[in-house]
Amino acid sequence: SVVVQAGDSQRAAQGTPVPVRPAVQVRDQYSNLVAGAAVAFAVDSGGGSVTGANPTTNGSGIATVGSWTVGTGNNTLIATVSGTGPVKFHATGVVPGAPKQLIVTAGNGQTGLIGYALNVPPAVEVVDSEGFPVPNKLVTFAVTGGGGSVTGDTMTTGTSGIATVGSWTVQLGANTLGASIPDAGVTNNPLSFTATGAAPDYDISIRPLTTMSPSRRAVFDSAAAHWERLIYGDVPDIPVNIPGDTLKKYCTGRTTPTLNETIDDIVIYAILDSIDGPGKVLGRAGPCYIRSSGFQPVIGVMFFDTADVASFPFDVVVTHEMGHVIGFGTIWGGRFLNLVVGPTTQGGTDPHFVGPQALAAFDRIGGTGYTAGAKVPVENCCTPGGGSNDAHWREAVFGDELMTSFLGATGVPKPLSVLTVASMGDEGYQVNYAGADAFSLTFAALRAQAGGGQAVPLVDDILRLPIGVVDARGRFVQWVMPR
């Protein structure tokens, strides 16, 4: 038998989904719950539509439609299981009345980097006296304080009743933005958003341990400045006093001065030396010491093979490896932030990054229709335990994105995408989405299809060093192997 489990007798604005998704429960002839039964949902009347029309029942015998969007007036939906049913759901599609209230739906109370758009564009919902969304209302957004600016200042509400400003760029200190409609008698009209503009306060200190030309040093400084535009918020300063021989043994592998200072926010040693000759390992990098609270790195090291620095785009490799020192792929694991599910080191075949900011950014760049596995796909291409797996975006999906495990062909851009920036937000950093390079999965797929030269694998570019953990006072806590 099949019975209604949830979602009958609802009301919703025409052209919008009902608030509770219809669900049925299936039992066999002995009243036992049936798992794995195929259920078909179909619109019976009213002119609405459904998504996820063919679910299967779960362990509780329940199957739920993806969504049911209603038309005007009376609507019915039927659910059928082979050999039984159908059962019917009812809903009323309401024509929204006049606007009665403006409601904040997104983007209030943010902090962002001055001179850049906030990560979440402010959005407002227009509703009638019953709380139903009102479509086709013109909403005007205007800066009311702080001296910032907006794009897309006049927007029209959709069927959801929501209008979203194109972007809101903030200046230092307090910023305010108003949203209004021309109708009279509307509560919260205008509606006010607040935001705080912050100056950049994340500092990367590059410490060369080998001789390098001014042009090579400039590449490191440029890469640091790039990351400092993307990670802008301060992290706790850490006072350290680490002997040079300890740094040599556990971090740099060479003579290193004693580090006796308060680190704000990370010190990165840079070394140009022979690794393994031309065309193999281009560089290796990773954190040497991390904070006990939050796990953000405080000291790290980057090695680059002198046999390769002139043969590949050095700036791209340095920017990539610096990302690993800061934490990309190196503090994701279960010993730290536990951001990767199904890593290849534990026998997984579809490792994926599960940070909420990255998941949202993946959809933003075109990942909503991704069906080849779980989101967000992490590299699984290579020998288990190798330096590429579980620590990069998956090359087969992301193509030329900077933080995949392959270096693109000469002349092919390697954009540092909003996905990578968002992943750093999941690591606990304050990040600036608007500083990311333009990137989409469609672009990545087209680039992969077009070819355009030989991609070079960034083989074993993650350092496998014990990572020292230090507390807020710089006291050593423990050594941890990265994975």
Regions flagged by a language model, labelled:
Residues 1-199:
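The feature marks long extracellular or luminal low-complexity segments
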Residues 198-319, 324-483:
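Extracellular zinc-dependent metalloprotease catalytic-domain scaffold
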